[in-house]
Amino acid sequence: MVPEMSERQEFQASEFAYLLENSSYDYGENETYFCCTSPPCPQDFSLNFDRTFLPVLYSLLFVLGLLGNGVVAVVLLSQRAALSSTDTFLLHLAVADALLVLTLPLWAVDAAIQWVFGSGLCKVAGALFNINFYAGALLLACISFDRYLSIVHATQFYRRGPPARVALTCVAVWGLCLLFALPDFIFLSSHHDNRLNATHCQYNFPQEGRTALRVLQLVAGFLLPLLVMAYCYARILTVLLVSRGQRRLRAMRLVVVVVVAFALCWTPYHLVVLVDTLMDLGALARNCGRESRVDVAKSVTSGMGYMHCCLNPLLYAFVGVKFRERMWVLLMRLGCPDQRGHQRQPSASRRDSSWSETTEASYSGL
């Protein structure tokens, strides 16, 4: 997926071309005019909405996402010798989210004015966006599976295996995401729309390719990771519910938030895209009012999905006690005074324990 502005413009252009190709004229005695298709719907409302809404939203998400994920990466790297498997996945997740939001200023310019960066950067920006879109979802699934093995089966899959096992898993995730992004390198290009008198970064393939790409995004970028997370955390909750102690109750609340946040951020977008795809395929009737509402809904719900990049630092790092302790240590190294007062500081051995031993997560809070 790339931000929805380009995809909508591409469909409008193809719709206009189809209209020209399928028009017929009858200059008979009465000089009548006949056209077999309806004219394209006016898009003034949705385009004006995008020009106002998307640049503001993308700019805000760029600042918050880069700052939050940057802090997570710095804190994790400051203690990289003591990183657990979950912490390593979180580091890669922070990098993926940061790289995704790095492309948002380009899409903000595309929405506000037009694409002014050429076809080369169009391909790179689109591929970078999609690589990190898929990586974010798949890394969350890896974290869920790691926690599931550790808590439900008391198996330290990565800790007791070869040291490179977690690194190889991350390499496999990035390689798979690069494979998923190949259509961006091949089919994305800057295209001038004569009807709109503007250039946009968009896909150049037929409707069948557009539908296939959307199915890939839905299955690989949402449904499969969500199913893995839901199953793993449902089993984790089953184990935690039969345990006692406030620490385990806090962990139970956190694992619920993990699945709920991912689902709430991305489900609306994929439902809207499903409706739009059904309209393209003719399964749902298309009219100008519905098309305009779907266009606006795609812009709003895609923004909700990108917000997940900003939530990840809060959900997977800042709620963890161990993360906050290490962040304070890093700040004190930089010369900041310790503002924690006389709070009790837990021993390092307890904070570094794995879930299978104390059921407390690494400082991700998972």
From Swiss-Prot:
Localization of this protein: Cell membrane
Post-translational modification summary for this protein: Sulfation on Tyr-25 and Tyr-27 is essential for CXCL10 binding.
Cytoplasmic topological domain: 77-88, 146-167, 243-254, 321-366
Sequence segments annotated as region (Disordered): 339-366
Membrane topology: Multi-pass membrane protein
Entry's Gene Ontology molecular function annotations: C-C chemokine binding; C-C chemokine receptor activity; C-X-C chemokine binding; C-X-C chemokine receptor activity; signaling receptor activity
A GO BP annotation: positive regulation of cell population proliferation
Composition bias, Polar residues: 355-366
InterPro entries: CCR1-9-like (IPR050119), Chemokine_CXCR3 (IPR004070), Chemokine_rcpt (IPR000355), GPCR_Rhodpsn (IPR000276), GPCR_Rhodpsn_7TM (IPR017452)
Glycosylation, residue list: N22, N30, N197
Alphabetized UniProt keyword annotations: Angiogenesis, Cell membrane, Chemotaxis, Disulfide bond, G-protein coupled receptor, Glycoprotein, Membrane, Receptor, Sulfation, Transducer, Transmembrane, Transmembrane helix
Residue intervals passing through the bilayer: 56-76, 89-109, 125-145, 168-188, 222-242, 255-275, 300-320
Extracellular topological domain residue ranges: 1-55, 110-124, 189-221, 276-299
Cystine crosslinks: C122-C201
GO cellular component: external side of plasma membrane; plasma membrane
Modified residues (Sulfotyrosine): Y25, Y27
Similarity-based family: Belongs to the G-protein coupled receptor 1 family.
Annotated function: Receptor for the C-X-C chemokine CXCL9, CXCL10 and CXCL11 and mediates the proliferation, survival and angiogenic activity of mesangial cells through a heterotrimeric G-protein signaling pathway. Probably promotes cell chemotaxis response. Binds to CCL21. Upon activation by PF4, induces activated T-lymphocytes migration mediated via downstream Ras/extracellular signal-regulated kinase (ERK) signaling.
SUBUNIT field: Homomer. Forms heteromers with ACKR4. Interacts with PF4/CXCL4.
UniProt name for this protein: C-X-C chemokine receptor type 3
Organism whose genome encodes this protein: Capra hircus
Source lineage: Eukaryota, Metazoa, Chordata, Craniata, Vertebrata
